[in-house]
Regions:
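Helix-loop-helix junctions that connect adjacent transmembrane helices in secondary transporters/permeases
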Residues: 157-244
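Beta-strand segments within the central parallel beta-sheet cores of soluble alpha/beta enzyme folds
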Residues: 250-257, 284-294, 322-326, 354
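A generic local secondary-structure boundary/capping motif
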Residues: 34-35, 62, 111-114, 182-184, ...
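Gly/Pro-rich active-site capping loops and adjacent beta-alpha segments
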Residues: 104, 115, 131-150, 196, ...
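Short coil/turn connectors at secondary-structure junctions
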Residues: 40-43, 67-71, 110-111, 117-121, ...
Length: 365
């Protein structure tokens, strides 16, 4: 379309446009993952930790395996025996001094310890959703609770309990952008300095449609079809292929039908989908999982939770002469794919770039 056509008669600029995609949704004709029913489908349910931090002293699925309709139980031990992989961060962030990021991988099942409420310790697959959820309650887990913190400033205190002891700290990375010396000098000479402490609360996307996965395994051709509530189906296929199940990419088809809200949470690769695909392959039949609303709050990717101290220096005419931002970003007990880079972008890039060139400094941890 030429510029003349866009602005002229029959063009679109400056005119209200009639939406064309809404009719089938308001008539109840949308097709979501949970609407898809395959013959012989089995259901998956997960056993999740009720503790924010605890040692797993014992785990037994024997009682659950004997429940009516149960087809399969899975734990970290089974995952390791199968040789499957773990999730890693897509965009790692290093420290400003060059040290690598303190990033622990995300296993499909907790091993030895749980690191947050909702951490998965086992899975049960059964003939029906009810049977799977009932059997999941029969899985026996002996926990030994450990100290935990939920506030980001408490997490960086000297005596804070460590989420991943091997790093010796709860700080994942620290990046500084800008010129510290020039910013401090400009701030010292400013006619007025305003300082503000800001709390950007943690949030859950909580879409109307919860996360849901349905995997169909074709044993004759050794290939998979995965229906997923995913905002990024191509990435999802690659992650299953490269990082976790090591399925050749050409043997895995991922379909995202209508998605009932995502807001970023459905763009994150979750561990539940790996388990469902694996279970479908083991059982040679379709396997489905749809999160409950409780699971949505416990296990969906969350956002924000930043504690920020912002300082701005002004000259006697009220013009900005310097700006300094220090942010603590709570990334959770287990890193999600883009979380570190998102914290960097929101603090170091989105905050600094709109302003005219002047001494600025931003630090995000």
């Amino acid at each position: 379309m030429t510029a003349e056509q866009a602005h002229g008669q029959g063009g679109y600029i400056g005119k209200a446009l009639r939406r064309r995609e809404d009719v089938r949704f308001v008539q109840g004709q949308g097709r979501y993952v949970d609407d898809i029913v395959l013959p012989g489908v089995a259901w998956c349910a997960f056993v999740r930790s009720p503790h924010a931090h605890a040692r797993i002293r014992a785990l037994s699925t024997k009682a659950a395996a004997m429940r009516p309709g149960v087809l399969l139980t899975l734990t970290a031990e089974d995952w390791a025996k199968a040789g499957h992989g773990e999730l890693t961060v897509v965009h790692p962030m290093s420290f400003s001094d060059g040290r690598p990021m303190n990033a622990a991988p995300r296993p499909a099942f907790a091993r030895g310890k749980v690191h947050h409420i909702g951490d998965i310790v086992a899975a049960v697959v059964a003939e029906s959703r009810f049977a799977a959820e009932e059997a999941a309650e029969a899985v026996e887990v002996d926990y030994s609770p450990l100290p935990a913190v939920v506030a980001v400033r408490a997490a960086v205190a000297p005596a804070a309990p460590l989420v991943h002891a091997q790093f010796g700290t709860n700080v994942v990375f620290e990046i500084e952008r800008g010129n510290r010396r020039r910013t401090e000098a400009a701030m010292a000479s400013a006619a007025k300095v305003v300082e503000l402490d800001l709390k950007n609360n943690r949030l859950s996307a909580n879409p109307i449609e919860p996360r849901s996965y349905l995997c169909d395994y074709d044993a004759a051709n050794d290939c998979y079809t995965l229906y997923a509530t995913s905002q990024q189906p191509h990435y999802l296929r690659r992650w299953l292929s490269v990082y976790t199940l090591h399925i050749p990419e050409h043997k895995l088809r991922v379909i995202s039908p209508d998605v009932g809200g995502g807001f970023g949470a459905k763009g994150i690769f979750s561990t539940e989908v790996s388990t469902g695909v694996w279970a479908a392959q083991l059982l040679r039949r379709p396997v489905k999982w749809t999160a409950t609303r409780t699971e949505t709050f416990l296990s969906d990717a969350q956002a924000r939770d930043h504690d920020t101290t912002a300082r701005m220096g002004f000259d006697r005419h009220g013009r900005i002469v310097a700006m300094q931002i220090d942010t603590l970003a709570a990334l959770g007990a287990k890193l999600l794919r883009y979380a570190p880079s998102a914290a960097k972008v929101s603090t170091c890039i989105a905050t600094m770039r709109p302003w005219r060139s002047k001494p600025m400094r931003a630090v995000v941890s």
